[in-house]
């Protein structure tokens, strides 16, 4: 059996019924754009460790199909995961004589530098948003004070806020997709079990949200009139805002990093921060924000030194 034939069977019979829609779409795209054109025509049993490793090396050297830039190790590792999962199933059901994809050597992913906004940049962003008269932009401030991911933010509906108790409930996320004909927005369960969480809102945020709710024409908190907002559209809005304010470009996720950094600077303990961010455990938080924690320790020790 040709590998592409097996991949289609695997996608529709083993992935689509059990995985999140987002996972299915991602796998289908990786297969269509990267795997099928190169090794889809090979017989499943001709995919030796050397053939698979050569394909991985070619991927690393070929670059992004749109931009031409180098493909990240994380992206290539996603492709490897698709190959390994599909070929493992092929072996289990008797399509492949043996399972050899576990012999692929994965590229080492570079550790991403955590980027956050300075206090001055944060204040500049907040002042612009709060004085813009555009309720749609308020999501930027909300992320600075809750650490929400962009998908979690844009999936929020008014039912997710308990104004009486001042609580925000994170129970879903959203992402952009394509149904083959048009751009669509897909709402899904959160990234992980721990991503389901309750976030107490700062008391200064509540009256601002109440004002937006009074003016709102949509069930979603962040909206374009009576319509929800696409993830890429909101990212682009944020990029343009930074450009207008003459602040160096940072991804939308930097708002989440900024929240975490400010929380640590204010003395929040790591366990509480970990729960607010929806991390699996505090170790993840410690590893990701080690630099911020060190700066906080230096500041605390310098304050202590002033007692001498």
Write out the residue ranges for each language-model feature:
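Catalytic-site neighborhood detector that most strongly recognizes the C-terminal catalytic loop/helix
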Residues: 112, 174, 206, 277-302
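N-terminal DNA-binding recognition helix of tyrosine site-specific recombinases/integrases
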Residues: 30, 34, 42-54, 64-103, ...
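Basic, Lys/Arg- and aromatic-enriched nucleic-acid-binding interface segment
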Residues: 69-73, 77, 92, 96-98, ...
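Active-site/catalytic core of tyrosine-dependent DNA strand-transfer enzymes
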Residues: 29, 119-120, 202-248
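N-terminal DNA-binding module of tyrosine recombinases/phage integrases
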Residues: 1-45, 50-53, 294
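Conserved tyrosine-mediated DNA breakage-rejoining catalytic core shared by Y-recombinases
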Residues: 155-211
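C-terminal catalytic core of tyrosine-transesterase DNA break-rejoin enzymes
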Residues: 92, 141, 145, 151-152, ...
């Amino acid at each position: 059996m040709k590998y592409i034939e097996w991949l289609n069977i695997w996608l529709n019979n083993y992935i689509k019924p059990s995985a999140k829609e987002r996972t299915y779409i991602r796998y289908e795209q990786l297969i269509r754009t990267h795997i099928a054109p190169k090794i889809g025509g090979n017989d499943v049993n001709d995919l030796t460790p050397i053939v698979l490793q050569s394909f991985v090396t070619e991927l690393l050297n070929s670059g992004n199909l749109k931009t031409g830039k180098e493909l990240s190790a994380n992206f290539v590792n996603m492709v490897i995961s698709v190959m390994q999962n599909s070929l493992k199933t092929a072996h289990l059901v008797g399509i492949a004589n043996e399972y050899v994809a576990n012999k692929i050597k994965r590229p080492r992913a570079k550790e991403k530098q955590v980027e956050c906004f300075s206090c001055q940049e944060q204040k500049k962003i907040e002042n612009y948003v709060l004085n813009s008269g555009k309720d749609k932009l308020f999501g930027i401030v909300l992320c600075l004070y809750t650490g929400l991911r962009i998908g979690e933010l844009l999936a929020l509906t008014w039912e997710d806020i308990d104004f009486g108790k001042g609580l925000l409930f994170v129970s879903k996320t959203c992402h952009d997709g394509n149904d083959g004909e048009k751009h669509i927005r897909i709402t899904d369960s959160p990234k992980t079990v721990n991503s389901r969480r309750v976030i107490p809102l700062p008391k200064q945020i509540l009256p601002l949200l109440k004002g937006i709710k009074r003016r709102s024409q949509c069930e979603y908190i962040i909206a374009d009139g009576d319509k929800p907002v696409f993830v890429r559209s909101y990212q682009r809005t944020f990029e343009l805002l930074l450009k207008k304010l003459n602040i160096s470009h940072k991804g939308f996720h930097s708002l989440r990093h900024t929240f975490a950094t400010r929380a640590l600077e204010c003395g929040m303990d790591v366990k509480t921060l970990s729960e607010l961010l929806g991390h699996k455990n505090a170790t993840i938080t410690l590893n990701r924000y080690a630099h911020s924690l060190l700066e906080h320790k230096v500041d605390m020790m310098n304050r202590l030194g002033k007692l001498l």
